[in-house]
Amino acid sequence: MAFDPASLTFDANGLIPAVAQDHATGEVLMMAWMNAEAVARTLETGRVTYWSRSRQAFWVKGETSGHVQRLIELRIDCDRDCLLLLIEQEGPACHTNRRSCFYTALREGEERIVLDPMV
């Protein structure tokens, strides 16, 4: 069955959440937003493109940092309102220079940093 981007469910701002996961390890790396054009650009180029809500502009992951995300597979959830991007990540995914943006764990009511910045 051919993919129809119009079948995705975008929010009132025309956005859909996209979770990036390392295709080899299963590690969840980050969550960002995509609009229909970002999805199309990602599928066309193989380089993950998000929509920056703060800058109101396209954001090709790694364009300035060199920490590129290459799309291996795009998955769509059952409600078609969330995307899972199985990717190959070069370097850290997080702007804090950590492998994952999910570096803070809540353990016994306390926040704990569980990932150090990459060197």
Swiss-Prot record:
Which reaction does this enzyme catalyse, per its entry? 1-(5-phospho-beta-D-ribosyl)-5'-AMP + H2O = 1-(5-phospho-beta-D-ribosyl)-5-[(5-phospho-beta-D-ribosylamino)methylideneamino]imidazole-4-carboxamide
Chief place of localization: cytoplasm
Which Enzyme Commission number(s) are on file for it? 3.5.4.19
Binding positions (Zn(2+)):
78, 94, 101
Q: What class of enzyme is it?
A: hydrolase
Where would you find this protein in the cell?
Answer: Cytoplasm
GO CC field = cytoplasm
Instruction: State one Pfam family annotation.
Output: PRA-CH
Name its co-factor(s): Mg(2+); Zn(2+)
**Entry binding sites for Mg(2+):** 77, 79, 81
Q: Supply one GO molecular-function term.
A: magnesium ion binding
Gene Ontology biological-process entries: L-histidine biosynthetic process
Keyword list (alphabetical) reads: Amino-acid biosynthesis, Cytoplasm, Histidine biosynthesis, Hydrolase, Magnesium, Metal-binding, Zinc
| Annotated metabolic or biological route of this protein | Amino-acid biosynthesis; L-histidine biosynthesis; L-histidine from 5-phospho-alpha-D-ribose 1-diphosphate: step 3/9
Q: How is the cofactor bound here?
A: Binds 1 Mg(2+) ion per subunit. Binds 1 zinc ion per subunit.
Q: Give a short account of what the protein does.
A: Catalyzes the hydrolysis of the adenine ring of phosphoribosyl-AMP.
Family statement: Belongs to the PRA-CH family.
Its quaternary organisation is: Homodimer.
State the protein's name.
Answer: Phosphoribosyl-AMP cyclohydrolase
Instruction: Give the originating organism.
Output: Cereibacter sphaeroides (strain KD131 / KCTC 12085)
High-level lineage = Bacteria, Pseudomonadati, Pseudomonadota, Alphaproteobacteria, Rhodobacterales
